[in-house]
Amino acid sequence: MAKQLYDYWFVQFDFPNEEGKPYKSSGGKMVWNDKLKREIPAGWSSKMISEIEGNIVTGKTPSCANEDNFGGDIQFVTIDDIRGNLFVFQAQRTLSKLGADSQYKKYLPEGSLCVSCIGTIGVMGFVARLAQTNQQINSIIFGKEYNKEFSYFSLMLHFDNAKAKTGNVFANMNKEEFASIYIAYPSIELLQKYHEIVLPMFDTIKTNTSEILNLIKQQDDLLPLLMNGQVSVNSD
């Protein structure tokens, strides 16, 4: 539903006009944009990712020579952790406070958007708790909440279009190239309206994911106890 509404408003440009009617289908004015090489609604602009949200962090791996850098409470996110997950609650590896603090500028607060930029480009997900990533990932730390879902789907569209043109998205994209991606940017009012509609949908996915992970953990904790007879299942 969130993706469908994004496509309707920001791809087909049939967001509600002043009369509540679909903008483009109702004859809304479209203007050519040189940066995007296509028409966009009058009043919209083309903006780079760095102009929309300027806090972009490229991940880094702390020194593997010091084992004390790993195995703690800080999730160390890689592409495999993001793949298939809109929200990343847990990573395969973690960092200790020592390891994470050794590169303190790489901390990502909850809600930051991680985007793979080396190898398979365009794998994306939001961190659901304090985290850091490896160097294959660029992340956006949001200063404006209303940019979150819009940025996620806009980048998805960008990478899908790039794949359609080249046949694949296997390449490398450095921080500057990622920050320089242009997207069609609407009014703040429209962004806020979209954010208010889709946020509950994203929150539901986040809550459900958390509950599933908790159930899996309970199962993993209980199974060994059942196997060695420390607990039993009451069939009554």
Regions found by a protein language model. Give the residues of each.
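Non-catalytic DNA-recognition/assembly elements of restriction-modification systems
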Residues: 1-5, 27-60, 76, 184, ...
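Short, well-ordered loop/turn and helix-capping segments at boundaries between secondary-structure elements
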Residues: 11, 120, 143, 157-161, ...
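Glycine-rich, mobile lid/loop segments that gate access to catalytic sites or pores
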Residues: 2, 6-13, 20-27
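DNA target-recognition domains and sequence-specific DNA-contacting regions of bacterial/archaeal
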Residues: 20-186
